[in-house]
């Protein structure tokens, strides 16, 4: 008899039980791993699968996490073969060419479209009922690409969008007011990145509108220069890339925040990228961030934001910029 047989006596033969809330992370780069660790530490799933084309890096990252199994409740698996991702509830796509210092998110686009042509069909093959969450940049265009390539209904394809931009915005407003970001209610909508739209008209603390107190807030004529905060939000990622070479932790936490709302069916409102055709005067088939309700079925509802004419105009301009790039893509 083996040591195992001497130690343990079987009472019954177990039937294999599938995971109820499996999450897959595609791409084990900086963002993928920050997303993975954030999901693990929030204890959001009973199985986490990781997949990447770089076999050694993938194997190393999976082993490193598995060595911490004692401190976790999640089974961790990884393989370059997409069968490892089978029956996922949520699939987070972080894979793609990395943004270089000074490179705009839109510049990355065709490089990443070609990568998606391999990734998306594989995800669909093994998890036909999953919710697809796109994080790779430029996120709004690549969410559109994932939607087109997957054939999924729009409520099951979500871009991480301006969830992080809004978090940066709330952090910086909190710094200026000496308040915790959770008490500063503020939204950034539109494109994730350079042409994002800060909704100054909606910024409030405890229901008190800041623009009600300072009607010039967010404009050139504002003596307190609140507008600089939005510039800091836009420049924030570039600054971090300049200093440490890439962004990872905040986007990882943002991804886990979105995954939690889906897995736990929280019906929480997040600014995420969805098909906005027909909203706020947008005519083209583009994905942009607006406040959306996330739950177990994916994106269940969109909140109708009251935007000022100037804010709506900026949103439409964002849509035109994205459509200009999208219509040139070869899918």
Swiss-Prot record:
Enzyme class: oxidoreductase
Compartments (UniProt record): Cytoplasm
Pathway the protein takes part in: Fermentation; pyruvate fermentation to lactate; (S)-lactate from pyruvate: step 1/1
Catalytic activity reported: (S)-lactate + NAD(+) = pyruvate + NADH + H(+)
GO biological process: lactate metabolic process
InterPro entries recorded: L-lactate/malate_DH, L-lactate_DH, L-lactate_DH_AS, Lactate/malate_DH_C, Lactate/malate_DH_N, Lactate_DH/Glyco_Ohase_4_C, NAD(P)-bd_dom_sf
Catalytic residue positions: 192
Residues the record lists as binding NAD(+): 29-57, 98, 137
Keyword annotations of the record: Cytoplasm, NAD, Oxidoreductase
Pfam family, one: Ldh_1_C
A GO cellular-component term linked to this record: cytoplasm
CDD domains: LDH_1 (cd05293)
Signal peptide: none
Chain's role: Interconverts simultaneously and stereospecifically pyruvate and lactate with concomitant interconversion of NADH and NAD(+).
Family listed: Belongs to the LDH/MDH superfamily. LDH family.
Name of protein: L-lactate dehydrogenase A chain
Organism (species): Chaenocephalus aceratus
């Amino acid at each position: 008899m083996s040591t195992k047989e001497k130690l343990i006596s079987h009472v019954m033969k177990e039937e294999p039980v599938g995971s109820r809330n499996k999450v897959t992370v595609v791409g084990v780069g900086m963002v993928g791993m920050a997303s993975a660790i954030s999901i693990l530490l929030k204890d959001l799933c009973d199985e986490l699968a990781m997949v990447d084309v770089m076999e050694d890096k993938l194997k190393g990252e999976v082993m490193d996490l598995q060595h911490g199994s004692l401190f976790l409740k999640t089974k961790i698996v990884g393989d370059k073969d997409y069968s490892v991702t089978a029956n996922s509830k949520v699939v987070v796509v972080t894979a793609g060419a990395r943004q270089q210092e000074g490179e705009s998110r839109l510049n990355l686009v065709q490089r990443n479209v070609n990568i998606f042509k391999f990734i998306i069909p594989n995800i669909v093959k093994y998890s036909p009922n999953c919710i697809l969450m796109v994080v790779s940049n430029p996120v709004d265009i690549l969410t559109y690409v994932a939607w087109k390539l997957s054939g999924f209904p729009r409520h099951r394809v979500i871009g991480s969008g301006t969830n992080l931009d809004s978090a940066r915005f709330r952090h910086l407003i909190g710094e200026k007011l000496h308040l915790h970001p959770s008490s500063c209610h503020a939204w950034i909508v539109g494109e994730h990145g350079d042409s994002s739209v800060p909704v100054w008209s909606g910024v409030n603390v405890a229901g008190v509108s800041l623009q009600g107190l300072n009607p010039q807030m967010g404009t050139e004529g504002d003596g307190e220069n609140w507008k600089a905060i939005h510039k800091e939000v836009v420049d924030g990622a570039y600054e971090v890339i300049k200093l440490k070479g890439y962004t990872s932790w905040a986007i990882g936490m943002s991804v886990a925040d979105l995954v939690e709302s889906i897995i736990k069916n929280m019906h929480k409102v997040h600014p995420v990228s969805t098909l906005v055709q027909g909203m706020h005067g947008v005519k083209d088939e583009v994905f942009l961030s607006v406040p959306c309700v996330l739950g177990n079925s994916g994106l269940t509802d969109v909140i109708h934001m009251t935007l000022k004419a100037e804010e709506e105009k900026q949103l439409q301009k964002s849509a035109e910029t994205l459509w200009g790039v999208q219509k040139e893509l070869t899918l």
